[in-house]
Structure formats: C-alpha cells, structure tokens
Amino acid sequence: MMQRRDIDIYRLQPTLQDLKDHLRITDDSHDRMLMIYLSSAVLQAEHVISRNLAPSICQIETDYTSLVTLPYMDDTSSLTDLEVLVDGERRTWTLIGSDVRIDGPEGQKMSISYHLDVAFVEADIQQAILLMAAQHFSNPLDRAQTLPTASENLLAPYRQWKTR
C-alpha cells in the first residue's frame, strides 16, 4: 500500500506572514526556509496532539478491498473531493466516519484521492507552532533536542492518547 500526503503550505495556520511578524522579519530573503520551518513545526504539533492541523491532498494506492480507512482523518478535519478508482474506473462510495465503503464489483487495484481541510486551529496551538518554527530558525544546526517548554505547555491540553 502506498500512502501520500501533500500539505498545502499556502493555507497553513499560522501563515508564513504570521511567522515573519513573530520573528520581526520584513524582507522575503528567508521565505523558503521559513516555509520549511513552519511546515516542520506544524507536523511536530500534529504528532504531539494526534490531530490533523494542515490542509492536505491525500492519495492511497493499494490492492482492492471493499472497505478502506482513510489515513490522516480525525474529528476536526473535513473531507472534500473524494475520488475512488478501481482498475482505472471511477466508483461510487459511502463514507462511514473515516472509512470508505466501495460500491460495485471487486477489482485488482484501487486508487483513492481526497482533500482534507482544517477549518480552525486554536490560538494557543498556533502560538506553539510559531515558537517551534522560531526555534528552528534560531538553531539551524542540529542542536535542538526537544520541544521548547512553552510549546509543550501550550499543546498539552490538546494531546489525545490513541490506542491502536
């Protein structure tokens, strides 16, 4: 099974401009690296709180099965543009929570693509992301060992412990 998730870096919360304001940067010379730091900080926060924080385009390619659990889905994400192809042909489907039931006859291979949207990221989560991205900017070498304490404290109320 192949799973791919491409983050829409231009719709992140907080934005690149928020990070530049936080760091008091007024020119565009650091934008490329700041975007990498911001994306990394968002993913770090996602891992800490077990919640999707980034608008994304997702794709799954796998052998046929009539029921697929969509990765990266959670209670705060909204799903749009879901498309299911079985052996290259579009299929109808039914969404049940984060599971997709495929209608029609069995096939060999299937591909599922969808967009995940995040409507709202709380202010304290955004602040934690800004602090983490700022730490990446301040320490471009591999010296930062852990999350900044302030970031940990801001994310702690949102941490969800999941069992698998």
Describe the role of every protein-language-model region:
Residues 1-164:
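Divalent metal-cofactor coordination and adjacent catalytic microenvironments
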